[in-house]
Regions:
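Glycine-rich loop(s) and the adjacent beta-strand/alpha-helix scaffold that form part
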Residues: 212-219, 231, 259-338, 517, ...
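Extreme N-terminal leader/targeting segments of oxidoreductases
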Residues: 1-18, 36, 219, 223, ...
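N-terminal Rossmann-like FAD-binding beta1-loop-alpha1 element of flavoenzymes
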Residues: 18-43
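A glycine-rich dinucleotide-binding beta-alpha-beta segment and adjacent secondary-structure elements
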Residues: 244, 251-252, 445-540, 544
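An anion/pyrophosphate-binding glycine-rich loop and adjacent beta-alpha core
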Residues: 130, 138, 145-193, 309, ...
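Helix-rich C-terminal "cap"/substrate-channel and partner-interaction subdomain
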Residues: 387-494, 562-565, 569, 579-580
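Helical element adjacent to the flavin cofactor pocket in flavoenzyme catalytic cores
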Residues: 201-270, 309
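Conserved N-terminal/central alpha/beta ligand/cofactor-binding core
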Residues: 46-235, 357-359, 366, 400-403, ...
Length: 580
């Protein structure tokens, strides 16, 4: 009997100089710099949009000693080095943070000179650890300039949306500074004019687009980077999965990619940059590396599942040393949206530090200065939980606070809270005792805590946790409130509470690299032409969080270093890039 034989499908082939895995800020920076350096560059994105976790973020980058600082007469290099030495100590190789401090300003200047990726400096944005020498009051963080999404044309929908809870009217973005101004809309002509301008633009946008096209924060940064990639005809493969990295004789030289149902063998003549965003969205890796109780939710992009880390380990790449928690944290409240999806709302600066709120554990007791950074706040939750149940933590305030500042997904000046109570997101009662019972915390402990705290609020001095005593606390408080911008009484019923739990915004455990972002193997030797940046790279800060935008600053700086190093490397014989 004759058998008909069907030939196996042939694997397609492609060749590029530089291949970047991941379309967040770090990956797009690497791809853009590669293209600007004359490399044939490919960006591979596993989803159908660019932006990664960057699109959900503030878009701030922490770059000490940047040009905008120096133009104001501030030479910040020595102080920043002192600050990071005090913060990180011996947990990570000092040469890596020195490489960051040296290259960060160069990266910004490079992009400013060659692209329209642009930032403006925060003059008043204090570093998170004001207790350490070298901490700055501002100047190191920079925010991306707003971007007109209409300039992307049909590619506008390729930029990932921010989380819905950080937009107004279902699609209008505003900056933190604009949010502060808009809170005065009933008392200020400036606020009224700003609101009218923003809403008018948004309504016009909605005639043609599914959301507003005035992009700010991380969306602006992602869109600016993406537009510059498009302008330079950088190849971007969406919905593409990398199955395997290929290495020969200690050199990363290619990868197998599945795209549109076909397997493609891609040769990379100069380098491969891993920028997959770490593993905050991987249940398996969270179980393996995170502290208990395990974080169930994440505020990161769902595609950050550690694929690139596992692929690199298959060719000998080394992970960094385990840290205290191997994560970078937000305390987040969890809600169910109308469409049934889950909202993970990060409590960053809009409520925790404002006057009139305390954070308590199951004993009804405070355990932390509520105004510390989101990372330190969540770490304090875990530390307290070792002795008394602190996960979830309850943020407790009164109705007056919710009206003035909002609470989690509840915006300021929300007139009716019944829907939030009915959904279970908000707990509310006429007395602290009643609220404590609904929350499941000790009523006597909560009553004593609020009584003590109210005394602190009247005196303006938090004897217990010193809230409002440093510049970072005060910057996150209410400058118009006296005597302490972070302390106010909790005294007018009804009383309210929202639960927060640890959620990873990123991971600090990643691939070990050298100062050029080149990944090293388990013997400490560089794997030639294999690079990592962002959360795929082991934290240069040893899991610490120095200031606003520190992670994006690292990601973009080492993405820049990776591309520059790859561009200067020798070309393997036989590649197209080797031909005259």
């Amino acid at each position: 009997m004759a058998h008909s034989l069907t030939a196996a499908p042939q694997t397609e082939t492609a060749e590029f100089d530089l291949v970047v895995l991941g379309g967040g800020a770090g990956g797009m920076t690497a791809a853009l710099v590669g293209a600007l350096e004359g490399l044939r560059t490919l960006l591979i994105e596993k989803s159908d949009q660019v932006g990664g976790t960057t699109a959900y973020s503030s878009g701030t980058v922490w770059i000490p000693n940047n040009t905008q600082q120096r133009q104001m007469g501030v030479e910040d290099g020595a102080a920043a080095s002192e600050y990071l030495d005090a913060l990180v100590g011996g947990r990570m190789d000092r040469r890596l943070r020195q490489a960051f401090l040296a290259a960060g300003p160069l990266m910004l200047d490079y992009l400013t000179a060659r692209t329209d990726v642009a930032f403006r400096m925060y003059r008043q944005q204090p570093d998170y650890r004001q207790d350490l020498p070298g901490a700055a009051l501002g100047g190191r963080p920079l925010e991306p300039l707003p971007f007109d999404g209409r300039l992307l044309g049909k590619d506008f929908d390729r930029v990932r949306w921010p989380i819905p809870e950080l937009m107004l009217f279902g699609g209008m973005m505003i900056t933190r500074g604009e949010a502060t101004r808009l809170l005065k809309i009933g008392r200020s002509w400036d606020a009224l004019l700003l609101g009218a301008t923003l809403v008018s633009r948004f309504l016009l946008d909605r005639l043609r687009y599914r959301r507003g096209t005035r992009l700010v924060l991380g969306n602006a940064l992602a869109a600016r980077l993406f537009r510059n990639l498009c302008d330079r005809n950088v190849a971007v493969w969406f919905d593409s999965t990398t199955r395997r990295l290929i290495a020969q004789d200690g050199r990363a030289c290619g990868l197998l990619v599945v795209r549109n149902g076909s397997e493609i063998s891609v040769r990379a003549t100069r380098g491969i940059v891993l920028a997959g965003g770490g593993f905050p969205a991987s249940p398996e890796l969270r179980e393996r590396f995170f502290p208990k109780p395990l974080a169930t939710y994440t505020s990161a992009f769902a595609g950050c599942t550690g694929d690139t880390l596992l692929l690199a380990q298959e060719i000998g790449a080394a992970l960094g040393p385990l840290g205290e928690d191997n994560s970078l944290w937000f305390p987040s409240s969890i809600a169910t949206r109308r469409d049934g999806s889950t909202a993970v709302y990060p409590h960053i600066v809009l409520d925790r530090a404002k006057p009139g709120l305390v954070a308590v554990n199951v004993a009804g007791r405070r355990f932390v200065n509520e105004a510390v950074s989101y990372h330190e706040f969540t770490r304090a939750m875990y530390r307290s939980h070792r002795t008394v149940s602190t996960i979830p933590t309850w943020l407790v305030c009164d109705r007056r606070f919710v009206w003035k500042y909002g609470l989690g997904i509840i915006r300021p000046m929300t007139p009716v809270l019944g829907g939030y109570v009915k959904s279970g997101y908000l707990k509310q009662a006429r007395s602290l005792t009643g609220l404590a019972r609904i929350m499941g915390v000790d009523p006597a402990g909560l009553a004593e805590t609020v009584r003590t705290y109210n005394g602190f609020a009247r005196s303006g001095v938090d004897v217990q946790f010193h809230r409002g005593e440093n510049a970072y606390d005060r910057a996150c408080g209410d400058a118009a409130h006296r005597p302490n911008p972070c302390l106010g009484p909790i005294e007018r019923p009804p009383f309210c509470a929202v639960a927060v739990v640890p959620t990873p915004l990123g991971t600090s455990l990643g691939l070990l690299t050298d100062e050029s972002a080149q990944v090293v193997d388990r013997a400490g030797q560089p794997i030639t032409a294999l690079y990592a940046c962002g959360n795929d790279m082991h934290s240069v800060f040893g899991g610490e969080y120095p200031g606003a935008g520190a992670e994006l600053g690292l990601a973009m700086t080492f993405g820049y270093l990776a591309a520059k190093h790859a561009a200067s490397a020798a070309v393997p014989p036989g590649s197209k890039g080797d031909q005259p």
